[in-house]
């Protein structure tokens, strides 16, 4: 075998083998990809990686990877397809058919035929039919025929016919009018708008939850830091008391009390560490960092040092106005009411009798050749008809459906009023919460400052022997609690603002988030 032939044969065999093993290779590639991802997860677990991250970064991660957002994002696209499906009712339909029919049989008459009657018929028809948004139905047909037989009495043999014809049916009562016939389109469009509001609500919930988890993590970082400082104060005090005990200034009871307090603070620090890790994991879950092979085990370092305090003057009436304008759940409910109005309209229309006016106009062309048939299809040979069709239902089922739709609307209106009451109460509650938390921050700031000043003074008194070990330990606890209360006040104030924005439907606007339509 020559070299070129061997090359061609080898390539052919390789091609066949590749085709047969394609499915197996694809499965193997998927398996390797899973193994690589598993390896990356395990490798990341062995690394001490630090991820510097801010609030804006967390929101960006959430918008990109949060599973609830990814699932809900598909809903408007599904509703867009429903709109196209509804509009398809008004798209024209082309139809065509071809029939060849041959018939040979014994003749029962001598008139025009011999002993055998033979016919051959070819039909070729085409047409366009459809419906306008007014309910008018149209049907435009082009009918052609070629007929040949062995009958001697047939004047044209073969003969061709060409018959253009248009038929129009116009409903007068039932199924008449633009509003009734486009009801499905309008409902589908409203359903899409409702799904967009639902998507907006999902994004708002995810963003608000992300911000809250971020502030919780910030709180537990500060909590861990405060507990660390508190433990250090106890250790420093223990060293001082050991030196004093050696000099006989304090008793063994003072040492025991200091050691007991230090043990309790070590326990509190461990608890703070556990809470910190849990808060870190919660933040990773909402941002979906937990599914990142490289970042799932990274230590999060916040670029924002401490929570901000920006005192805001909140206007209750303006907040309520915003809620009724921007809240997705309220807007979605109003869209649903519009759909119910449309369903009542269509149910009421179904009560009317069917009265359809029909009319058709056609031309008859006949000739020995097809061209002759085309030329003879003139107004001299017309085919027309007019008429009407009447159907009067007993009305039992249609009347029941109409009554049902009215009751559903009344029920929905009551539901809307209840929702409006809940919105008012919720917004008022959130406005109050912001005001209370703002005052809490002011009070806790003063308390922290006073406790810090008091502890500094008590330290001097303790150094002078005027304060007992028990008292100085108590002052340390009070200082740590005051510091923690202030941080908690800041966190709670920021969370109150987050909840207020969400209750007004302003979460996306306040965070400069614009959703794609």
Role assignments for model-derived ranges:
Residues 1-9:
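Bacterial N-terminal signal peptides that target proteins for export
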Residues 10-18:
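Bacterial N-terminal signal peptides
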Residues 22-27, 33-43, 47, 104, ...:
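Acidic, low-complexity, intrinsically disordered peripheral segments
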Residues 46-50, 98-166, 301-313, 345, ...:
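Small/polar, glycine/serine/threonine/aspartate-rich low-complexity segments that form flexible
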Residues 61-70, 77-92, 125-158, 167-184, ...:
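A glycine-/polar-enriched beta->alpha junction
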Residues 62, 250, 254-255, 289-358, ...:
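Amphipathic alpha-helical coiled-coil scaffold segments and their short linker/junction regions
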Residues 71-86, 202-227, 236, 243, ...:
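Amphipathic alpha-helical coiled-coil segments
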Residues 86, 196-319, 433, 478-479, ...:
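Periplasmic alpha-helical coiled-coil/stalk elements that build and connect Gram-negative outer-membrane
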